[in-house]
Design a protein with these regions (language model features):
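Ribosome-associated RNA-binding proteins
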Residues: 1-182
């Protein structure tokens, strides 16, 4: 058995789960609703207010899908009940972010502004011109948008300036050593 796939997923009181045809799962909660379709090799059942994920056979592909399906379902349940957030910070002189409706303009030492639009279900907030918060119910979308923002100017390995996740430790490389006189 898969160590992750064996674990039960507890369903909070305010979350409703429907299992449709072809493993089409819809999860509804106070924050919104998510739907996803999973492979037929995996069985998904609801018993005693928890979700049980099992597999039909012990083929290699089924084993790999077992833990993945359980993790994706757990992310859906947590997303509709609590939601997900990723925070980023901009370090350095001249690095700023500006909110423009649902989009943000990033000034990251380029000749132009980087404009990043928030897709449906994702909200982007800018605080103090240097702190950015990405939030939503879909963990994959939140992480993807946060990664796009970070990739606009990743931290410089020598100075540490750039866009980084809040609390991210950037290991700095040593600079050039002074050349020894002969």
């Amino acid at each position: 058995m898969s160590r992750i796939g064996m674990k039960l997923i507890n369903i909070p009181e305010n979350v409703e789960i429907n299992i449709g045809k072809n493993n089409n799962i819809s999860v509804k909660g106070p924050k919104g609703d998510l739907t996803n379709t999973f492979r037929d090799e995996i069985n998904i059942n609801i018993e005693n207010n928890s979700i049980i994920v099992t597999r039909n056979n012990d083929e290699k592909e089924s084993k790999s899908l077992h833990g993945l399906t359980r993790s994706l379902l757990n992310n859906m349940v947590i997303g509709v009940s609590k939601g997900y957030t990723k925070s980023l910070e901009m370090v350095g002189v001249g690095y700023r972010a500006e909110q423009k409706g649902s989009a943000i303009n990033l000034s990251v030492m380029k000749s132009h502004l980087d404009v990043i639009e928030a897709p449906d279900g994702i909200t982007i907030k800018v605080e103090d011109n240097t702190k950015i918060t990405v939030s939503g119910i879909d963990k994959q979308k939140v992480g993807h948008i946060a990664a796009i923002i970070r990739s606009s100017r990743p931290p410089n390995p020598y100075t540490g300036k750039g866009v980084r996740y809040l609390g991210e430790q950037v290991s700095l490389k040593p600079g050039k050593s002074a050349r020894a006189e002969i």
